[in-house]
Amino acid sequence: MLSAARLQFAQGSVRRLTVSARDAPTKISTLAVKVHGGSRYATKDGVAHLLNRFNFQNTNTRSALKLVRESELLGGTFKSTLDREYITLKATFLKDDLPYYVNALADVLYKTAFKPHELTESVLPAARYDYAVAEQCPVKSAEDQLYAITFRKGLGNPLLYDGVERVSLQDIKDFADKVYTKENLEVSGENVVEADLKRFVDESLLSTLPAGKSLVSKSEPKFFLGEENRVRFIGDSVAAIGIPVNKASLAQYEVLANYLTSALSELSGLISSAKLDKFTDGGLFTLFVRDQDSAVVSSNIKKIVADLKKGKDLSPAINYTKLKNAVQNESVSSPIELNFDAVKDFKLGKFNYVAVGDVSNLPYLDEL
């Protein structure tokens, strides 16, 4: 079986906090606090990115330097990441040091000082660097544009702070107050004893976080199809398609993504990447073609779209996808379960399209 018998998984609630843990006979543990505070929930463009960059700055009880040095002495590391759904605070450490890291993450969530000088000297420069790096990748640019034209708001919000909309320190504090609540976060541990984690969480500042409400969307997001955008870019050219996916069709598009990027498909050599981004209320399937030569990109995207419009039998990739999905779920605290029973065929209908790079020599949507 894919689920190792030695792994114990439990999920419960500590004063309305969702806590999950898996134990395993290894020395290294990880602790993650996943907050539903990603860019889709942003009250202003980029505020989630700036809040994410404020994590592990000075708190009311520890300086940022002290936090890093304490963790280094214990041999551990901290990291804070952002995506469209979550701000995730993560620590990796030796198993016996769990109490320290529970308290450290709780301290960040509950007592970040939000000093004005940190915004100008640390947070904004780091956020601008993130944005500059992302802007150098034409695939990343195409992906962001696909989200924007597909969903417009919510999932279509900019992932990173670009400085277009002014975000003040008070805006960041207010957003933190909105998302850093008991009902809006999940605590998970890998190679952690479940009973110990629940006890340490209960004894930490996490249990005193203010009450609020879960921001998790319960309804399917509004989306648009047949949209197009074109972005001039010096470098490689990219042609990308995006398809919004409802919850019932997630399994089909998961199989499609694996099929198109494997040796099972004759199109795999033409495709740079294809994936399904899954959310609790749906998803977005994206496919990218990238090359230095815009003529190659143009030819390949036309071949791919024409072939997908004819229809594809996905059955050869179902078992492969089941295996891959099961392995991935082993490392996810709250996986989105997929039912592959009804997956058979796929035929491309309406989709959204983005061209990045030498757009004068890339096709338009109505040419595909």
Swiss-Prot record:
Gene Ontology molecular function, alphabetical: metal ion binding; metalloendopeptidase activity
Ribonucleoprotein recorded as keyword: no
GO biological process, one term: proton transmembrane transport
Listed PROSITE patterns: INSULINASE
The family this protein is said to belong to: Belongs to the peptidase M16 family. UQCRC2/QCR2 subfamily.
Oligomeric form and interacting partners: Component of the ubiquinol-cytochrome c oxidoreductase (cytochrome b-c1 complex, complex III, CIII), a multisubunit enzyme composed of 10 subunits. The complex is composed of 3 respiratory subunits cytochrome b (COB), cytochrome c1 (CYT1) and Rieske protein (RIP1), 2 core protein subunits COR1 and QCR2, and 5 low-molecular weight protein subunits QCR6, QCR7, QCR8, QCR9 and QCR10.
Designated name of the protein: Cytochrome b-c1 complex subunit 2, mitochondrial
UniProt organism field: Saccharomyces cerevisiae (strain ATCC 204508 / S288c)
The gene coding this protein: QCR2
